[in-house]
Amino acid sequence: MAETLEFNDIFQEVKGSMNDGRLRLSRQGIIFKNSKTGKVDNIQAGELTEGIWRRVALGHGLKLLTKNGHVYKYDGFRESEFEKLSDFFKTHYRLELMEKDLCVKGWNWGTVKFGGQLLSFDIGDQPVFEIPLSNVSQCTTGKNEVTLEFHQNDDAEVSLMEVRFYVPPTQEDGVDPVEAFAQNVLSKADVIQATGDAICIFRELQCLTPRGRYDIRIYPTFLHLHGKTFDYKIPYTTVLRLFLLPHKDQRQMFFVISLDPPIKQGQTRYHFLILLFSKDEDISLTLNMNEEEVEKRFEGRLTKNMSGSLYEMVSRVMKALVNRKITVPGNFQGHSGAQCITCSYKASSGLLYPLERGFIYVHKPPVHIRFDEISFVNFARGTTTTRSFDFEIETKQGTQYTFSSIEREEYGKLFDFVNAKKLNIKNRGLKEGINPGYDDYADSDEDQHDAYLERMKEEGKIREENANDSSDDSGEETDESFNPGEEEEDVAEEFDSNASASSSSNEGDSDREEKKREQLKRAKMAKDRKSRRKSSEAKKGKDPNAPKRPMSAYMLWLNASREKIKSDHPGISITDLSKKAGEIWKGMSKEKKEEWDRKAEDARREYEKAMKEYEGGRGDSSKRDKSKKKKKVKAKMEKKSTPSRGSSSKSSSRQLSDSFKSKEFVSSDESSSGENKSKKKRRRSEDSEEELASTPPSSEDSASGSDE
């Protein structure tokens, strides 16, 4: 038989709201920890008197009764877990776990039974419903009616406001059944009645929330705040935690009382009661009890006469009456030596206190965040002009808290504190405009594998390559229309005609030099474009026969473990699967990772070997291709070098232009159409006719003409 039993996702009903938590059964007793509030129920094994198993709305439930009349109910068990629990109760608690069914007839008449702190409405021997009397806030009576009103839970979507019972009259003389019913309820109900004298009174205390000065009257079961406008009665059972926090100026102290449910002022709810004290203010306090009562009730924690600082007296009395520890700041010390950090939350500035088990911010609005609620924290820069940073906290429920305007000098201390508490740090990247000097705020999760991020990087690379390829393609279209050989011919044709009478030889020489320089410049630009085009074609023309790159150790492990993760988490999405795999990989030990590192190393060696073989084979084929290309180019050059028929002036100009032709132009693609060639022939014939018309007659012709 196991020494302990643990159950997750167990629910406890708290004033109409179902709070999940974790239940642990051991030989010493039963412990339930509320996941939302962190409150712990500890039931000693010797206090248990009865255990009941029954069907409820959330599966099956466990009802436990103790010797002092307390009742604990936990729901969310499966039917198959009954035998395991029954054997555990018999072995360790010597109790029989009884099965009991609820009545579902739907009748509205029956018998009311009071047992411990429960009111049970029964039909026959079966209970219909039960009301915890500690949830009753008010009990009023009528002629034949009793009305119960309840404390409200702000977290409950639907709340039960009141229940009204009709109590029929009886024939017994001297007994009022309505009054008897009401007295049974009031004896166990959490109804605040300021009867008797207060144990002590603190006058005119400064309260930050709710704002004002209040007289605090301490009663045995509740705290009474009496102000000029409002009165609050706070039962000690609603106090969750107590905090005593030193102000940054070292002259004041905060005393914070965490409440659940909160006190209300109109539509405003106050989850925290914050008192502000001066360290220099002292008080002498006398309790309104005799010494024997003080000793018996508080067991040495308080004495009848006490004196000291006002904040010490208030905190000491509250600790004794509420019976809860006072939380103080831990070992954290900021840059200025204080145990807190000055920052802003929402629209107000305040103080953030790093505690041993959480963070608390005071005072407007006060915020308390436990470490077990935190999903991750983040350090981020606010703007470029301020020397400050933001500290962000996101809870597991998705709520985000941003504490801004923290001095840069506090960064190191806060970062070390967060690391020491082993909180997850997720840096979302520094905001735009950050100086290079702020690299201190780099992400601490560099080693964490993010499959989604890697996939996005790969897609970005592919898009960038496609963009480059498309730009190169557009460049090729413009390059094809640029044929340097043809342009040179056009330039040469401008000088085909013999010098006209109006042009000088010097001007012609200078024009030729300028044209030559321009042609050289164009040739160089074309060569650069062609080289860029070739490199882009090499990128595009990826050989499908080339060896594939080896996978990393993580990817090898992921491919082998993907099906197992899917089976362990049925219905998981692809994104969540990658995220889950990254978490599992990060949590793996070095010994387990070494196996996949070896496989990755073997794959890398095989890739390098295959790459060498592939490069060797590709080198031979490329050499053959190059020799073929050289032969083709040589043949074209020989073909072009043969002198064309025509006038001597035209051939000389053609030779001049050919002297500036590069190898690239000689081997350019033969894209000139026959139509362009015919146009040029017609243009050359017209030029020759113009030359004949414009040439002056020779001396011999003129002489013969004169003779005629």
Curated annotation (Swiss-Prot):
Phosphorylated by CK2 following UV but not gamma irradiation. Phosphorylation inhibits its DNA-binding activity. The modification N6-acetyllysine is found at residues 233, 413, 542. It is found in: Nucleus; Chromosome; Nucleus, Nucleolus. Keywords: Acetylation, Chromosome, DNA damage, DNA repair, DNA replication, DNA-binding, Isopeptide bond, Nucleus, Phosphoprotein, Transcription, Transcription regulation, Ubl conjugation. Residues 625-634 have a biased composition (Basic residues). Residues 512-546, 577-624 have a biased composition (Basic and acidic residues). Residues 497-507, 643-659 have a biased composition (Low complexity). The modification Phosphoserine is found at residues 444, 471, 510, 657, 659, 667-668, 671-673, 688. GO terms for biological process: DNA repair; DNA replication; nucleosome assembly; nucleosome disassembly; regulation of chromatin organization. The modification Phosphotyrosine is found at residues 441, 452. Component of the FACT complex, a general chromatin factor that acts to reorganize nucleosomes. The FACT complex is involved in multiple processes that require DNA as a template such as mRNA elongation, DNA replication and DNA repair. During transcription elongation the FACT complex acts as a histone chaperone that both destabilizes and restores nucleosomal structure. Belongs to the SSRP1 family. This is FACT complex subunit SSRP1. It comes from Mus musculus (Mouse). The gene is Ssrp1.
